[in-house]
Regions:
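Long, low-complexity, charged/polar intrinsically disordered accessory regions
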Residues: 72-124, 128-289
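C-terminal accessory regions
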Residues: 1-76, 82, 119-120, 126-129, ...
Length: 290
């Protein structure tokens, strides 16, 4: 692992789901109350649905519920990681705790063994000169998990919803699991709806996706990649005629944009260049911590 003890403030900015004092039940109740609409297929798969059915909203709800659902698990991991009690307490009350747990979820979605990896990151170097241990751990974790786990030849796809959002796994209450699964389903449905509507309406940005292949298997791959681009546009409310719109505004969007760029590159790859395109995508992923 590459270990550097420089906390990156850009990666620890406040997140909508960062509220370490909220109970799981109150968080779930708050999300449902703020959803503004019943989570039904009828209301969420139409192209004209309002803000409450967008991926921007559904992803924010998913991440808020995920943070509450996994809070106890990550707290136990931190307390058993080799930190002393005072250090562990400081991590749990840090403003960077939410960003750290989001990074843990992302790393697990990339198939890293968090229970083994995290204690090794704690033991890599002390924290005597650290102003915020949570920020330092966030930085170490992001550096150590910059690529999906596995060898270059046997690397498996990360567990992402609509190609963008890290899936929350592990033990949690049935109520939390149901809330996450429901939003997972709605996000995937919304991505399909956005793509289908754009194709039907012949939106200018869809021209950059290239034609749908005739062969069934190739057509499925094409649609899978095109849905990532559609999901990215919906999550960040992009109306530009180019597929990915203007430059990303923050680190979270940069990561999502890199994933969408990789998907777009697969759609537009020329025959005979798969290895070159794959190398570009992997290099870009390393730079952004994908």
């Amino acid at each position: 692992y590459v270990i550097l003890d420089r906390a990156d403030d850009d990666h620890t900015e406040p997140h909508p789901s960062d509220n370490p004092d909220a109970s799981s039940r109150s968080v779930l109740y708050g999300v449902v109350q703020h959803s503004g609409a019943e989570l039904s297929a009828h209301e969420t798969i139409t192209a004209e649905q309002d803000h409450w059915g967008s991926i921007a909203q559904l992803a924010a709800e998913y991440e808020t519920v995920a943070a509450a659902a996994q809070k106890d698990r990550w707290a136990a991991l931190i307390r058993d990681s080799g930190l002393d009690d005072e250090q562990a307490d400081s991590v749990l009350v840090s403003d960077a705790f939410g960003a750290l747990t989001a990074e843990l979820r992302r790393a697990e979605a990339n198939h890293h063994d968090i229970d083994r990896l995290f204690p090794r990151l704690v033991a890599a170097r002390g924290f005597d000169d650290a102003e915020d241990i949570a920020k330092v751990l966030h930085y170490r974790l992001a550096r150590a998990t910059a690529q999906t786990a596995g060898s270059a030849r046997a690397r498996v796809a990360p567990r992402l919803i609509a190609g963008l959002i890290a899936r929350a796994d592990g033990p949690m209450t049935d109520q939390m699991r149901q809330a996450l699964d429901e939003r997972h389903r709605l996000i995937e449905q919304r991505a399909s709806a956005v793509l289908d509507t754009a194709l039907t309406d012949k939106k200018p940005w869809t021209r950059k996706l290239g034609p749908t292949p005739d062969e069934e298997k190739a057509a499925r791959r094409w649609r899978s990649s095109a849905r990532v681009v559609a999901a990215y546009r919906d999550r960040y409310q992009i109306t530009d005629t180019s597929p990915l719109g203007p430059p990303a505004q923050n680190d979270a969007q940069k990561v999502d944009r890199a994933r969408a760029e990789t998907a777009l590159r697969r759609l537009t790859a020329k025959p005979g260049r798969p290895e070159q395109d794959r190398a570009v995508a992997q290099r870009q992923g390393r730079d952004l911590g994908l």
